[in-house]
Each structure stands twice: as structure tokens, then as C-alpha cells.
């Protein structure tokens, strides 16, 4: 698929068929996630891929509102941001900081880079002929997810992505694009100055 088609077709899919997702597609999706930008090549992301019983276990742990529409997707990816990878990397001699201070980071790139990896997951799913939806994990559910899947303490989940074959065409009923339009280009993009 052409890149512009992938960008144009990407949307949050909220209903999935029971058709399985091939291992090859999952591996391509995850390989592309690893190709995202990484400040200082810190590579401070990790991903937990869940299928079958593990996926059901995840859904049983989180609040029902969190992933109701995503429960039927056969694949779930939980992306994690690893702040320490960035703090350690930028304390190395070639980066010029002598400490691991967070004050050097007015924008926490561990979240930015992990978010870019999520976008690559969403776009690759489209390229594979699949649908996907990103959703948050409630703060009250993070510890249960961490314990159930042996997630290291320094790995922070930034949400989850459900992946599968979309059960419907177009925008899902109740989805935000049905209630509000995309902001006009000229209202959002400013050339030279505001």
C-alpha cells in the first residue's frame, strides 16, 4: 500500500472479526515499531504482545470501560516507556550531561518516542490490511498488569493497542469523528509565525 493511503486510511477500529492475525503480520508490525525515532538511540521502549489466554487475562485485570471495544481483537500490544534508558544514555560522555537529571528534559522523550512507536504499530496494521485501536490503561490497573505479566518496575505502560481484522467499514458508531470534524489545516498549521 502506498504511504499516503496508509496515512489516509488509518483510524481507530473498534469492532473486530474473529479471524486470526498471522504471526508474520504481528512480527512485521513489531519490527516496524522498533524502527521509530529514539533520542540518542536510547531505545527506551519495550512491548508486551498478548494473544489467547494472556490477552483474556489482561482484559480481566483492567476496568471494563478501558478496553470494552477492543476485547474481541485477537492481538494486544502493550507499549512501555523506559525513562531510565534515556537518563542513562544522556549521562554518557558523548551526550554532555554528567548526571541523570530529569530537569534536562522539558519534554519527556521516553513518552514521545514510545508514542511514535505506537503510531508505527497503527500504520503498519493498516498496511497489513488490519485494523487497530489505541486505548489507555487506568492508573488503578497498572500495578495489577505489572504483577500479572512480570513487567519490570522501571517500565511504564503508556496504553495498549488492540489489533485484528476490522468488522466494519468506515468510522465506528459513537466514534469521535461522528461528533466533531477534523480541524482545518490553516487553523492548525502556521508557516513563519502564528
Task: State where each predicted segment sits.
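N-terminal amphipathic, basic helical "cap/leader" segment at the start of enzyme domains
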Residues: 1-88, 191-194
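Solvent-exposed alpha-helices and their adjacent loops that cap or buttress functional pockets
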Residues: 39-42, 69-71, 126-127, 149-153, ...
